[in-house]
Amino acid sequence: MRLRGKTVASWRILLSVLTLAAAVQAKDEPTIKVTTIKHPPLNLNYFEDSNTVLYQDISERNLYRSEDAGITWDRVKDIPDNQASLLTMHSFDKNRAYVLTQGTEHFKTTDRGKSWQKFSSGAPPNIFMGGDILHFHAGDPDRVIFNGADCIGIFCDLITLYTTDNFKSKAKFLRGNTEGCYWAKSSDLFTTGKDDLDKQRILCVVRDNFSPFKEDNRLLASDNYFQKVDNKVQEFEPDMDTNHGVQGVVSLAVVKKYLMVATSSLNTDEMGLFVTDDTIKWHRAMFPTSHGHKVNQGAYTVLESTNYSIQIDVMNTRPSNPTGVMFTSNSNGTFFTENLEHTNRNTNGHVDFEKITGVQGIFMVNVVQNWEEVEKDTNRGGKHVQKEIVSKITFDDGRTFHDLKSGGDQLHLHSVTDLDNVGRVFSSPAPGLVLAIGNKGKSLGKFGDGDVYVSDDAGVTWKKALDGPHKYEFGDLGSILVAVKDSHKEDIGEIRYSLDHGESWKTAPLPDDLKIKPELLTTTQDSTSLKFLLVGKTGGDNPKFHIIALDFEGLHERTCKEDDFEDWHARLDENGKPSCLMGHKQTYRRRKKTADCFLNQEFKDPVPVTEDCECTDADFECDYNFIRDGDNCKKAGPIIAPDNVCKNARPDDTFKGSSGWRKIPGNTCKRKSGDQKDDPVERKCSEAVNAPAAPADGKIKAVQHVFKTDFKDFEKIYLERGESSTEVDETIIVRPVEYSGNSMRADNQIWRTKDHGKNWERILQDEDVRGIYPHSFFKDVVFFTTDSKKVLYTIDRAEHFHSFEAPTKPGSGNPLSFHPDKKDWLIWVGEKCEKVNGKETCFTEASISRDRGDNWKTAMRYVQKCEFTGHSAYRYRDLRQIVCLAHKEENNEKDNPKVIVSSNDFFDEDKTFHQDRVKNFALMAEFIVVAAEDQEKQGLRALASLDGVSYAEAHFPVNFKVSHQNAYTVLDSSTHAVNLFVATETAEGRRYGSIIKSNSNGTSYVMSAQAVNCNDQYYVDFEKIPGLEGVALINTVANRDKRNEPKKVQTQISHNDGSQWAFLPPPKADVDGKSYSCSSTEGDEKCALHLHHYTERSDKRKTFSAATAVGLMFGNGNVGSSLSSLKEADTFMTTDAGITWKNVKKGAWTWQYGDQGSIVVLVQRASRENPVKTKMISYTTDEGKTWKDFAFTDKEVTVLDISTLRSGASRNFLIWCKDDGGETFSVNVDFTGLADRPCKSDEGSSDYYLWSPKHPSQPDNCLFGHVSQYLRKKDDANCYNDARVQHLYQVENCTCTRADYECDYNYELGTDKQCKLVPGTSPISAEQWCKENPDAVEYYEPTGFRRIPLTTCIGNGHNELDKQSKAHPCAGKEDEFERRRRTSGIAIFFAVVIPFGLAGAIGWWVYRNWNGKIGQIRLGESSSLDNDAPWVKYPVIALSAVVAVAAALPLVASALWRRATSAYESVSGGGGGGGSWLSGRGNRRFTTRDSFARGRGDYAVVDDDEGELLGDDSDEEV
């Protein structure tokens, strides 16, 4: 079973089946009545313990009801026609149900649908949550949570409301920015242990106010409905991970008595599973270390668990032909042990697993017998290795497994992966009775060749019941079995039934010679009824559906008496006597199979009698990290020590730990006196999980490794770890290379280290690797191409390697594109050649794989490139969306222009052409930026798209002319705007240009900076500082009017996202205390600090700062009027984000950040200008106040590079060197000996202090409307950061001031600092503004000011400079305008609690959205334009932020039988198409107006592949 975040009362409550009936009665036969309808009856639900049934007509959006088990049906008249969008049954009250509409008025019943009352939710349903709109309290049926969405156009704010009176009054606002809220008491079995908490505790998955990414979601709890006390929301974050909360919460699910939370993080698809049985004490789910099992997204399934443990199946093979491993937890859901390997799964994550209802400890599972062949399967030739599947059964909850037997033959059964009906696959509440479809033999055959088998002893013995596959059901607690033969044709005209446990069968014809294709067969949830529903289909392509009611009440005249019953024992020994199962004997009273009577006890469930046994060896299993070895349990990993044991101990200290055995969870056996099998034994602390580390000795260690190569450089791929990863390695893959211009030669030696360079080993020695391509988003994954179609890859950090065959040979560029959310989705662009009539034609072809290369589908031919543009953070795009640059016609003719082509379904049916004569496109943050020819103006035009479907042309500032020679470079864009560099001087050696910045949809541009320096390849001296809002550095050309002189370059900084630029203030003296030749307090054009920038870096990834080192920057440069040569440069640093600088080293030193900014290492790197040699590094642990030297080698060497994890989180560094003898080697420098204590952030005794950035010209710390406080480690704290520090500690909003506004479009700043209309222009019109902002409801008459969207300042009307004029509705939005004028509690929440326009901040947006690359993208061709145009006076328009979305990946999918529509489609062969259940269409809206990326200083994760330079390849020829 797969869960979706909510517990359901019974498996049948969420199933879909229907019936309208007309009766035909025959003597000694069941009564059969047929109702014929136009549309499939979906979402059929029985009210528990009744014959009342509901179903939905999805097409007509109506609800139908029957109160006689489907004989007669009536449309529910209390609900208006065409309003019923979603039927939801109350999970804990068998008389209640709800029908949701698309609006805010919905319907409920408390009397099993006899009457329906309207209720108000206060917001429309949140369609992004599928069917999980309502969540019910298990102890009080009146308490209901409603997950809604407040939408305007495509913009949605996700909110949650609640009721404590079953919506008798209007729903109350609970919380905003939610991805789902849940009552803690969400199942009958779960309890917090306190009545008041059970009653009111609510847990919400909450998105970060400043981030749209799921990796920043958090779990927050409240015991008073998130109400405010003293203006502070009463909520707290549970300490899920020992003593702190966990980011990246994507889902929550209640499983029996456990509450599970799944978390995700950047760089990995490994998830963290956290479990609690009281919401107070949490544990991370721990899996055995012996086989390295991990819980990855989309690769694990929470099975139907027990009241005493959780069972999970984890996929461990290729996704296209998967198998899994099954685990069972201990009693608190924390420590999992392995039950069974090689379980059979399908690509949807369904597992062949089912428990026998009502009998503890028995379940059936299918395993793959030829698993070795399946695991080696490479799908060569398009054919997979066929699985040989065999069935197993366990009677001790997975400790041991046995074959199924029919007679003396082995029996194999079709299970969940071959689901043929709704409901459970095998069993029902009928004690001991099991039906299945299967076959005898060595392994499972085809479903169509299977027969029906029956067992009446809970699966111990089986016998054949019917020929061929059937759909089947149980009634009257097993007194009657009903079956209908399966068929893909409309040729079934009878049903079959048995009154003696399947020994004999009778037939009954359908009335009026009706012949159907059976779709499903069902009955009441508890299988106590004698009434059944059969749904069939006729009519071929114009189908009709028949709901057939079957009533067997007249077959037996009498009700069973005591003599008609027998004791049935769940387990018998070899002598036929009751034996112990899970520590007890279990006995049911059930009808004898030969008795000619019915129980007639509708809705009364069977109750077993149990008797506990004394414990034996059979009641124990191997404990966590122990594996069975004969009669013993052998240690296979570290041992769990009790809390607070071994924390400050020495390795040889001891504790009482596991003996290797544990009592099977749920086993009820009575312990004997004396020693027990699971008594703790003496263990050493060195054997424990998190064993004590060696104490810090205060020493730095260096380890050298020599590479036998003639090459002098290395291609280095650091595999970053995700926060949710259980790995602790620091893996690097390197190979020696040599760069020459834009080309690279590689030595075919590939090395791997798992410990950051202390030890190295060769990998892939027998393979001829051509290219190495790390996955852009999942850092555990790396691909290796060859000169053939063979592609090698690893998904576990180079631990194991696999291969697939690509559809074409790789071309000259990067052949792979990756999806940001789906690890296994790939696009391959390669070269294909066809020979026709002796002439060979070659072209590039794009192919798509959704299973990591096992299967490929051709997407397009004659393409230049394709990219996945779907992203979970952008719900306005389909997750499957792909955008390609391709030739308009499928040929290589010169006059064949390129176009943009998009698809939202992998090019299956949707294939849309956009624009013409396109030069290139680039992805940057949420934008798709396109450069196309403008034939009319003989130049280039820029276009942008947010949704990948609509491409709007860019409008440049007044008089901004773009000629055919202009070159566009898309710069790092991280504030919901395109930063576009346009070259204005194109003479070689003199190139520079302007940076213009777009509005929120990428279409309207204004000036940000002019005369910005670029090199001859149009790379630009522009860099945003990661981790902080609004800080950027540029280099400008000061002497642009003197074309015959070399460039005079100056450095400038912006602290407000490019609205203003200033020089860097020079330090007063150098590191030796000597004054500089000039001085300036703030920096000016005559005296300032100037830094060597992006265009001069041999490695473009060497940035001034790292996001984890908040506020710290280093640079090489000089003090003076302009930038001097690198040979004359010294090294400078700042600790306050560039407001003040100091000289720390003479000469140009290169730097790396470690331990999240707590360690900075400098070394003198050799360059052509300065071929220096050294043997020393210099480091600081106190933000540069003091520096210490360390000799990493005995003699001076040439340092080629220094590297570490790009996130700056490691305490290890690698120095790459070459000695005088030409030998190339690396030196690992390990700083872990400096500290052995993890830093604490406890209030009162914290190792951190709070630091706030500021603007140098503003008196307070308000920047962009708020004061941000960041955590930084104290200088004297002798500790290390053991987890990712949440640097952004808190944000407090300020009152709006003039600094929060800028001049509106077509306005310029006057001498009086007021915004005045540019002569000859007009203010933007209402029509134009509403057209450019299609989701806006209202328009304000222009005041000349507009709010800087980065600001979060709080306005009150009087201080809002952009709203001191009259508001008007946009055309067609008058009603919404009026509605929004009426302020509600929810409106106040959005206006105050979540400030308008929380803007994106600089740092990590680009790293997370632009394929993990850093750098710049060039579009189009080079050009020139007038540099004296009047637009240079325009202030920049900081952008209106565009919406992005946090994606809530489900923890696990719903139980196969719990999804109404999908269940019906799975058995009917339906599906496809798709669209929202609410809208009936596929147009999805997205969230939110208020969620934007904010730099928090903890996401400086940069790929090792450089930002691509995407130029015009002059109509490439292949």
Swiss-Prot record:
Q: Provide the glycosylation site positions.
A: N307, N332, N1001, N1293
**Organism superkingdom:** Eukaryota
Q: Enumerate the Cytoplasmic topological stretches.
A: 1407-1435
Comp. bias intervals (Basic and acidic residues): 672-681
Signal peptide positions are 1-26
Q: Which CDD domains match?
A: Sialidase_non-viral (cd15482)
Record-linked SMART domains: VPS10
Parts of the chain on the Lumenal side: 27-1385, 1457-1518
* UniProt subcellular location: Golgi apparatus, trans-Golgi network membrane; Prevacuolar compartment membrane
**What is its membrane topology?**
Multi-pass membrane protein
Q: Which UniProt keywords apply?
A: Glycoprotein, Golgi apparatus, Membrane, Protein transport, Receptor, Repeat, Signal, Transmembrane, Transmembrane helix, Transport
Q: Which family does it belong to?
A: Belongs to the VPS10-related sortilin family.
Q: Can you name this protein?
A: Vacuolar protein sorting/targeting protein 10
Naturally occurring in which organism (per UniProt): Colletotrichum graminicola (strain M1.001 / M2 / FGSC 10212) (Maize anthracnose fungus)
